[in-house]
């Protein structure tokens, strides 16, 4: 791995972590709007962003846990897995477009995080499987993700695309 690529990974990780920590409690828990998730849009443009964003999620969840913002130890692992799977699927489905935008790819993090984190929260807060609790958490997580990846993602689509093109040129 070249020094430029390592630098790029470090920058993406740092931006993701900083956005999570600056937003504090809004980035953690069942009712969250994790603004850093807008960076997931970068996965549409280049698969090289998947691992840095996964690492950023891992570190943000770990630091959140250590700071008392994130109360689930398992979220450090499952949240990171959800980010990794979302990034892969976003990249794989990037060619499916609606009105010249990758809307399906932008919705994927909401679905994946809603399922994985919804199950995690439902199991943590109840004894056994509770479908209605899972559905509640799924909706909470899904809506927060959609606000970040779809609505904010559409607003920042062009700048993020330009950043990705610049990075592809330079790195």
What does each of the following model-derived ranges do?
Residues 1-51, 55:
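Hydrophobic transmembrane alpha-helices
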